[in-house]
Amino acid sequence: MKLNDSNLFRQQALINGEWLDANNGEAIDVTNPANGDKLGSVPKMGADETRAAIDAANRALPAWRALTAKERATILRNWFNLMMEHQDDLARLMTLEQGKPLAEAKGEISYAASFIEWFAEEGKRIYGDTIPGHQADKRLIVIKQPIGVTAAITPWNFPAAMITRKAGPALAAGCTMVLKPASQTPFSALALAELAIRAGVPAGVFNVVTGSAGAVGNELTSNPLVRKLSFTGSTEIGRQLMEQCAKDIKKVSLELGGNAPFIVFDDADLDKAVEGALASKFRNAGQTCVCANRLYVQDGVYDRFAEKLQQAVSKLHIGDGLDNGVTIGPLIDEKAVAKVEEHIADALEKGARVVCGGKAHERGGNFFQPTILVDVPANAKVSKEETFGPLAPLFRFKDEADVIAQANDTEFGLAAYFYARDLSRVFRVGEALEYGIVGINTGIISNEVAPFGGIKASGLGREGSKYGIEDYLEIKYMCIGL
């Protein structure tokens, strides 16, 4: 693997500041989704190694939380600077193991680093309260303290940003962390860990355990030393983890599945709506939890929008993410391809029509053509299930009440989008949509300064913003008698 800094390519896990193999010597191969080539391997660790990482995090906790917020911020700022200095290497590593175009990968590294920078400063603003006493001889004080050892389980679709969005607030608050990255994309996590060491993060404060999801996850959820778990992934797995954490009453943050509606009203700027649909639907080949999954277009502009979207999609360039000009890379694996094919076949069987794409790409493997379906019926699978691929199904709607009812008819509530010019409509629809995030006249919503998270079956808690650090803090009330 060609990197400017070859030491960023790590094939061992990090526990208590040491790079280690699995106790049993077993390993997991990591492949390039663009061509199937083996990139390397990482240790297939289990419960014993995870327990060792938790113990290390627990031992490191007293000294780390005893530092001042400014001292922790200095170390985190070093980490941010190193991420940006090594942006090209980190992006290349990400494209090789995840598949997204290099330009997108570079953007993700910048996005990931922004959480470290943001929370380095937010850690200095963990304020308490002084409450007017209920009695003359009492003083009431509220302070916030780090929750303790935390665990994070992160997905493959954003292998850097989903880590820093958790590690940033945890470390800034004075907590320590044990991370289990996705087995498809562990090298990004290990490279970040290498930079954390260089930044001055003490041994045991940030640990990365690779290996069996079941064995590692079970230890993270059952070990009483872990006081909080943060997970980004499917709703199905999130439910299981929440049940497991209930035994010890662990604090849980969950960022789960989505089924985002993308609504185009008849007063929308159609060119901007198409631009937003491209960004929301086809970024990362549609493999994002906030990507548009259902496109609702009002009758009066349906045909024009479909034509404009088709023209725009036809200009997308599919290929290996390292090649110049590529805008869509491969899907992560064969299962992802099969899910897209299943949703297309189901919609066609129920009356939808393909106007663009509709089948695997001529490159073969995990590549799939960007696809647009029109006249999609409400009972199609794609209206109820998250596709996680480059499929844009267009549904018709008559009026505001109709589309709000359709958009909210789902168990999910992560992100929604709509395009409209009427100011009254903007407020009515924005408030009526049952989602944690609403993008209005924009298809890009994620950043470090705003709260990210969903409602209903899409999760618990918020990441990013001033609220993101709260999930890593405990509130303590002290009543002082004079």
From Swiss-Prot:
Keywords: NADP, Oxidoreductase. The active site is at residues 255, 289. Pathway: Amino-acid degradation; 4-aminobutanoate degradation; Amino-acid degradation. It is an enzyme of class 1 (oxidoreductase). Its EC number is 1.2.1.79, 1.2.1.-. GO terms for biological process: cellular detoxification; gamma-aminobutyric acid catabolic process; protein homotetramerization. NADP(+) binds at residues 156-157, 180-183, 233-234, 256, 386. The keyword DNA-binding does not apply. Coiled coil: none annotated. InterPro entries: Ald_DH/histidinol_DH (IPR016161), Ald_DH_C (IPR016163), Ald_DH_CS_CYS (IPR016160), Ald_DH_CS_GLU (IPR029510), Ald_DH_N (IPR016162), Aldehyde_DH_dom (IPR015590), Aldehyde_DH_Superfamily (IPR050740), Succ_semiAld_DH (IPR010102). Signal peptide: none annotated. GO terms for cellular component: cytosol; protein-containing complex. PROSITE patterns: ALDEHYDE_DEHYDR_CYS, ALDEHYDE_DEHYDR_GLU. Pfam families: Aldedh. The keyword Plastid does not apply. GO terms for molecular function: glutarate-semialdehyde dehydrogenase (NADP+) activity; identical protein binding; NADP binding; succinate-semialdehyde dehydrogenase (NAD+) activity; succinate-semialdehyde dehydrogenase (NADP+) activity; succinate-semialdehyde dehydrogenase [NAD(P)+] activity. Induction: Induced by RpoS in response to multiple stress conditions, including shifts to acidic pH, nitrogen limitation or high osmolarity as well as starvation or stationary phase. Induced by gamma-aminobutyrate (GABA). It catalyses: succinate semialdehyde + NADP(+) + H2O = succinate + NADPH + 2 H(+); 5-oxopentanoate + NADP(+) + H2O = glutarate + NADPH + 2 H(+). Belongs to the aldehyde dehydrogenase family. Catalyzes the NADP(+)-dependent oxidation of succinate semialdehyde to succinate. Thereby functions in a GABA degradation pathway that allows some E.coli strains to utilize GABA as a nitrogen source for growth. Also catalyzes the conversion of glutarate semialdehyde to glutarate, as part of a L-lysine degradation pathway that proceeds via cadaverine, glutarate and L-2-hydroxyglutarate. Homotetramer. This is Succinate-semialdehyde dehydrogenase [NADP(+)] GabD. It comes from Escherichia coli (strain K12). The gene is gabD.
